[in-house]
Amino acid sequence: MHCPFCRHSDSRVIDSRETDEGQAIRRRRSCPECGRRFTTVETAVVAVVKRSGVTEPFSRGKVIRGVRRACQGRQVDDDALNLLAQQVEDTVRAAGLPEVPSHEVGLAILGPLRELDEVAYLRFASVYRSFSSADDFEREIEALRAHRRVSTSR
């Protein structure tokens, strides 16, 4: 690790701690050349494999932008979107795989979004599952109603 102050090519780790609920490691480092200290944060990169085969790092921001589009005009605040994105990231990381298909990210979005806002869920699902007719919407609405009945009967 290069020192950010003197650019020396070596540093010594003084302390390491888990942060972000175990998703990252915070390391306190010392430069043997200039003696200054600095902090690094290390995270494992989860890559998303798109349908085209292109691989890109998982992005909470991209999840939020996609869900925000589905929530347009709905009473959904930024905190709820951030929490949903965190849930999606946790689900993706829990798979324990270095690469996750974009399809799995979409599936990870559907569950929390259904709980957050049913209309936004229908909008997102209609694009994600490529609805082509009103029948597709009717089937999904019936599945939502069945899910609601099961949830309320508990």
Swiss-Prot record:
Cofactor remark: Binds 1 zinc ion.
A biological-process GO annotation: negative regulation of DNA-templated transcription
Domain ATP-cone residues, every copy: 46-136
Key word RNA-binding present: no
Zinc finger (unnamed): 3-34
InterPro entries: ATP-cone_dom, NrdR-like_N, RNR_NrdR-like
Cofactor: Zn(2+)
Keywords: ATP-binding, DNA-binding, Metal-binding, Nucleotide-binding, Repressor, Transcription, Transcription regulation, Zinc, Zinc-finger
Pfam families: ATP-cone (PF03477), Zn_ribbon_NrdR (PF22811)
GO molecular function, one term: ATP binding
Entries under PANTHER family matching the protein: TRANSCRIPTIONAL REPRESSOR NRDR (PTHR30455:SF2)
Family: Belongs to the NrdR family.
Function: Negatively regulates transcription of bacterial ribonucleotide reductase nrd genes and operons by binding to NrdR-boxes.
Name of the protein in its database record: Transcriptional repressor NrdR
Organism: Mycobacterium leprae (strain TN)
Lineage of the organism: Bacteria, Bacillati, Actinomycetota, Actinomycetes, Mycobacteriales
Gene: nrdR
